[in-house]
């Protein structure tokens, strides 16, 4: 069970939140504990960081959870209701490090601060408790601090809404990254729900509790685990959704934002409301919600996404993934944009080719590209700095990040101004040029070179930016010199060379002269008006002046006033920056776009990639293709070069469907690598990247499916074979004539004849029904005879050489079928005992002899093709005629029925079924 949703009702000996909120608990609590209980009751699903002096303390179940997650000591603090109070704490100065660990573990944290001075509390009574309140709700999807965020990954909060209308419910997703302001919406369907969620990779998914507990969707949320956080269904009310979004953006209508479905509005409204709740009504600088069409991106199902290791390997590491192999970006924004593009490849050839044009332009100008990348290297993460400033969490270094980013943008704009650019890069250049130059000039004139982390430390406004601030700093830092100057002035004015300005705790600053020299200050009207007598000593007299008194006050208040001026300047600069939020975000996206294009251009040159031809045809012709990840790994290891192989799944002349290659060959021959590399080349091409091939022509793929590798799902009671069949079923049910399917070893997890039969039928289905482009690797050599009847099916094999009883894997793909799998040779290489290998050879010889007496080629004549078998089954069903229930259903018109009539009809149908 998700511990986030169950934080208020954990079992065990520790008092729960409901126990603490009881009358008995409140009546027996100390004033401090009563305050804690009240605040905790308002935040039951969060760990409460309760500020006490220099520590954040946690009590009761929160302490138990936090001590376990953080690996810190669990101690005790007195008793409550007859039970000891578990307690642990973390120092305030190190709180971010502990928050990072808790957020990474999926916890939500409410940060409770002291909101008044202890002296103020004492005015209400000697036993009054200092007021405390929650100033921040920290959740995995709503963090903005650099320490808690990965610079190269987006940090999405996602909302899932479901609207029941008609026979099928409507689903929609809204996702927000408050650290960058991205806000997007998309409709989805139950069948692709998990795939769409995993494509976005949210850190936190909020959804109605009614949806969370829907048994039909349980498998989805089991996969997501603690990422899914149920919320009250009222948060997703579509009736009030448009009004809530309009209020957030301060507009009267959303018509200017575009057209959205009810489900999309419900999801967007829930996301916005959750952001406001967690930010305590502060509003991050969110962009206008952008609507994504499901058809605009390549559909990649969850199993395929995992098997192809796009962003992470199966072990969860970024190293070894496709993303890691392609990433040559210089900025955090560029790294995030590349990851987003790779996870959501396009299906529109025009947009794909715009991206490819940008890479080609930069690849053709290597020196220019190097200069652009050098300038990009100096661009900080402007969107995240902007978000912190908008939320009131920013510091001087965030202003500095905006300043440095705008400087880098100006340098890049100058580089691009006279260059030959693609349409995409021209648009990016224009967005950069639209940055307000006066804002950069103001930042340059205001900010110091060295900036502190916290604004309360001061020192971030440069000298000369404010005359009053310079004066206050001079008084604060150079008070002795100022006093000495004033003393010299008074000496000259009075002619008393022994005049001194001194200081004590009683009089403060004062002028002291000997009694014999005081005449010029006491005997004339001008002297008495100028010098005010303060004290007479035995041998001296002390005076002050209005000027000295004012100077004393200024010196005493100079530090406070200097900081106040800096804070006022900071707030003014923040307002100016936030007012230009849209221009800054547009420029930041432009910089990221340039960074991605330049990085992929460098990659193409470095790895000898080529520009693919991408269009709306059904072509899939790869000449000299390579696996991008494996090839780079071999180069790093200084091993043998990667063996390139072609692949042509284009429709044969006159045929409408795509071609299928049936790939046979030995274990360790490279079948799986070949399958994966072609899928990755398709993804790279539709991402808008050059590809590892000598040439490539790809008609856009709408859906990509793979069934590669073996794994079980013990938690859900699924064997390896069951998982294989579920994934294969999804492919056969969803693949279209524009899809690309790669299947590896279908049917290997069961008895030989069962597996062969399933693989046989699957190949026929792909050819006759799906009509997709496909690669089908198998050790069932009997399947190769299908090429005689299936016109778009071709046999291909991984080539090997035998030498003195050893097998040499050439890793080359060629036409034809393998006559054996060389499994025994691989077993010998793996170190199986010689006796086992010898026995295996004997058994294999007998089995092969038996197989020659009943060759598989006879099956092709004995078995009808897939479509024939399907037609027979359909004919058998048709001959029986429709049932009474089917006839009754056809006669019903739900739109013309009252609720009562519909209920009566339902009972009648149920009764008819019971009588059968």
Swiss-Prot record:
Annotated SMART domains: MUTSac, MUTSd
UniProtKB keywords: ATP-binding, DNA damage, DNA repair, DNA-binding, Nucleotide-binding
Gene that encodes the chain: mutS
Protein name as it appears in the record: DNA mismatch repair protein MutS
Biological role stated in the UniProt entry: This protein is involved in the repair of mismatches in DNA. It is possible that it carries out the mismatch recognition step. This protein has a weak ATPase activity.
Keyword Glycosyltransferase: no
Disulfide bond residue pairs: none
Keyword Manganese: no
Species this chain originates from: Rhizobium meliloti (strain 1021) (Ensifer meliloti)
InterPro entries for the chain: DNA_mismatch_repair_MutS (IPR005748), DNA_mismatch_repair_MutS-lik_N (IPR007695), DNA_mismatch_repair_MutS/MSH (IPR017261), DNA_mismatch_repair_MutS_C (IPR000432), DNA_mismatch_repair_MutS_clamp (IPR007861), DNA_mismatch_repair_MutS_core (IPR007696), DNA_mismatch_repair_MutS_N (IPR016151), DNA_mismatch_repair_MutS_sf (IPR036187)
Family: Belongs to the DNA mismatch repair MutS family.
CDD domains: ABC_MutS1
